[in-house]
Amino acid sequence: MSVYSDQTPNPVAAVVILAAGEGKRMKSSRSKLLHEIAGHSMLSYAVTAATAVQPEHIVVVVGHLRDQVEAHLAEIAPHVLIAVQEDQLGTGDAVQAALGQLADLNGDVIVTLGDVPMLSGETLAALLNEHRTQQAAVTVLTAQVPDPTGYGRILRDADGLVSGIVEHRDADDAQRQISEINSGTYVFDATILRAALTEIAPTNDQSELYLTDVLALVRQAGEPVGALLIDDRWQTEGINDRIQLSRMNTEVNRRILQHWMREGVSVVDPSTTWVHASVDLAPDVVLLPGTSLEGATSVAAGAQIGPDTTLIDVEVGENAVVTRTQGSLSVIGAGANVGPFAYLRPGTTLGAGGKIGTFVEAKNARIGAGAKAPHLSYLGDAVIGAGANIGAGVIFANYDGVRKSTTTVGAYDFVGSNSVLVAPVEIADGAYIAAGSTITGNVGPGELAVSRSRQRNVSGWVARKRTGTKTARAAEAALEQKEPS
């Protein structure tokens, strides 16, 4: 959602997102920017924040593992422009690469980082407003943090105005005591930025072109440099290793859960409950310990999820109960009951009031209202009518080694325990399948299908074949009791 209206005067000329770094400390074959926070890539958060201020252009600067990053951008934001930083020569060089995609650009340019996922569009809008209000040439977003290690420090003069930024590795002992840090997010006047970038030089320990040096040049030229100090330090937190990634995930999840609890959702144990940013929950939902809701999962009012349940892209109806279940790309109807230890694979739809019970696996199965499969069954490529009862141990044999076929069970059918339905087969409404049957042909309405060998009892077999065993002795005792006195 945009933080500006379509009538906002002087729109942002461009937002530049720096996403070219190597991310060595992640020790990953994936680009750092593609690692996820609450179900979304770090880079997607940056693009969302940038989009919120309605810029004329969004430019993402790529470099390390650029093919991965470009492919991801093609999925989530095909409208963005791509600039390539061929060599890792610093943030100043990266911005120069971005401006190469924006010839004759005038107006305000926001520069931000791709690995600061909690930075919001509202904060970018506030930074832009501060920049325009102060009529500054450049405005930097800052925060006070308890441990500034690794961050650039904000230098201020005797009047409290920003005089420059020094990177941590280049700071002296006194400067390292400063707790106000550079977030890496700025608003620049495009003309001033373009000119200043031609003047900065690699005079630091890394022999890189620092974008931060632009502030000192602007200040030396007598142009105003502004700053917006924000209270929420998490909006300036970058991610460079797995520890920081874990910490950020925890903080984002904490905020997501707090949001939903304020909206009427009960979370019994927030420390073990994880909810993605894209999940939708209704009032009076209860999340029990060990619950993980991911992707586009939605849970309607009054439903109870957990404990120990993971749902990915699952729609849960009102007052449903889902216990110790793994599910993905499925629909659970209102008042339905699932679990414990159920497995819902993609394409499963359980109707209102239906039941999928203990150790039942369903895949591409449409299960009607009130139908039940209480335990120990496999329902693969199935169409099950309303009110049908699937007994324990029933297998829908859907695969012949070459192709998968569908089994149809009609409304209010009764399928006896330990039966195998060999697809393709259709069982009409109101039919019975005797326990232990292997069904290979269609069954008509009201028919009983029995497909099993006739039982034969062999008298005396245990005494002859298992002589001396406990079983034989038990049989002998039982026979003696049956003999007339």
Give residue spans per PLM region.
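Rossmann-like NAD(P)H-binding beta-loop-alpha module
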Residues: A143-A174
